[in-house]
Structure formats: C-alpha cells, structure tokens
Amino acid sequence: MLICKVLKPLVSTNRIPGFEHKHLQVVLDGSSNKVAVDAVGCKPGDWVICVGSSAAREAAGSKSYPSDLTIVGIIDHWDPDSPKQIEV
C-alpha cells in the first residue's frame, strides 16, 4: 500500500471498452505523479491509501480490470512532515 496526495482529476473520454467510466485522479507518490482509479470519491488535496498490482484491479471492480493503482481509502488525518515515531 502507498500513501499518496490527490493532485487533480484526470479526464479521459476515449477509453478501451474494459476501462468503463471509473473516475481517475492524478496522485503524487513521493516525487512522481501517477494516475489512479478512484474507487472512493476523493477530491484534490486529500491524502489517500492506494494499492497496486492485482489488489488494484480487484479494488477497481474485477481481476481483469486494467489498473495498476487504485485509491481504496481517504486518510482522515495525516501529517507528512511529522517525525517518524520511534518505539521505545
């Protein structure tokens, strides 16, 4: 799983038949932009949990769905600048 920030929606009206009409979002994963299928209805600025590989296809609706990154959750609170917690 990845923690990503949603940057903006991506509109693609000309798609292959199996791609259906699922919403797409541009997300920031570290320093790179990626396209993710939005399975939860997030908006720009949200921090989200994304899954990849076969989990992404299944989360998008089917193991045959052509996705390698799907948003599966919106994070309620995330401070990316907070220091890592150290277990004592």
Swiss-Prot record:
Residues 1-76 form the BMV domain. Keywords: Bacterial microcompartment, Carbon dioxide fixation, Carboxysome, Photosynthesis. PROSITE patterns: BMV. One of its GO terms (biological process) is carbon fixation. Gene3D superfamilies: EutN/Ccml (2.40.50.220). GO terms for cellular component: carboxysome. It holds the Pfam family EutN_CcmL. Homopentamer. Belongs to the CcmL/EutN family. CsoS4 subfamily. This is Carboxysome shell vertex protein CsoS4A. It comes from Prochlorococcus marinus subsp. pastoris (strain CCMP1986 / NIES-2087 / MED4). The lineage of its organism: Bacteria, Bacillati, Cyanobacteriota, Cyanophyceae, Synechococcales.
